[in-house]
Amino acid sequence: MRSLLLLSIVFFVVTVSANKTRELCMKSLEHAKVDTSNEARQDGIDLYKHMFENYPPLRKYFKNREEYTAEDVQNDPFFAKQGQKILLACHVLCATYDDRETFNAYTRELLDRHARDHVHMPPEVWTDFWKLFEEYLGKKTTLDEPTKQAWHEIGREFAKEINKHGRHAVRHQCMRSLQHIDIGHSETAKQNGIDLYKHMFENYPSMREAFKDRENYTAEDVQKDPFFVKQGQRILLACHLLCASYDDEETFHMYVHELMERHERLGVQLPDQHWTDFWKLFEEFLEKKSHLCEHTKHAWAVIGKEFAYEATRHGKEHHEHKEEHKEEHKEEHKEEQH
């Protein structure tokens, strides 16, 4: 009974908070209109002018308009229409914030809409948008601190849902491509792993240095060496597990760190660039096995980029940890001498 009461109180507090957030943000949106008037049209154009003036990296998502100035934005009819679309999206997100199910569903729909238009943006762009949107609103009206915090809250929850849904979509695309890459004890599965290493040794000779006594192997040598039968299955299993866990960010990151520690235990130290190159060669390997559409290539690039980032981060932490241990040993040695 007590648990039910506590749950009811928590639900009430969350609902009241969401209602207040919605109320504050909707009030500020009175200065960013959505209708057919010239004033509303200019409100939308002004948002894009602010974006193009202050966030030039975002221009690349507007094909053939990458070099636009604020004046170009003002004179292009595209932004009159697009400005109303983006403001409408902000109004809907704000209006539905106290209905989290609808808010999340609309957030996912916005991401899917961008995907259908072949516009793929990294997660940080969605976060940056709310910063620029708050700056834009600040030019239209005075935003007090509670209103700023309310927009921060909406932006944070929006970005969280985008990231969650985006990870599901990436996982789905990549898992589909792995249907053509069996792992197991069959001859086909064994050959899949060997083929990956043959591609590596043929096209990325610098990576051979990680294979002691096999640095001068040809693709034919790889084919004949039983080592690559077993190792091929290991590396493909790792790729399957990375893909399968991608929609669970914490598990994905933990598994990347486990892979790095496994290499360290084996005395294999690879330069950061190798981790980036691996995903490039893996995509090429998949392309040989089955045609990859652009969506799938992009999805693998997303996984590869995040993997490489985590691998590099782990390497830095490992190095710092070793240096700390060295300093500790030095201090201990000094104390022993005294």
UniProtKB/Swiss-Prot annotation:
Binding site for heme b: Q82, H114, Q231, H263
Family note: Belongs to the globin family.
Any one Gene Ontology molecular-function term assigned to this protein's record: oxygen binding
Entry keywords, A to Z: Glycoprotein, Heme, Iron, Metal-binding, Oxygen transport, Repeat, Secreted, Signal, Transport
High-level lineage: Eukaryota, Metazoa, Ecdysozoa, Nematoda, Chromadorea
Glycosylated residues (UniProt): N19, N216
Function: Has an extremely high oxygen affinity. In a vacuum, it takes several minutes to release its oxygen compared to milliseconds for a normal globin. Could be used as an oxygen scavenger for sterol biosynthesis.
Pfam families associated with the record: Globin (PF00042)
UniProt feature coiled coil, ranges: none
Name of the protein described by the UniProt record: Extracellular globin
Note on domains (UniProt): Consists of two tandemly linked globin-like sequences which each bind a heme group and a C-terminal extension which may act as a cement between the eight subunits.
Organism encoding this protein: Ascaris suum
Compartment(s) of residence: Secreted, Extracellular space
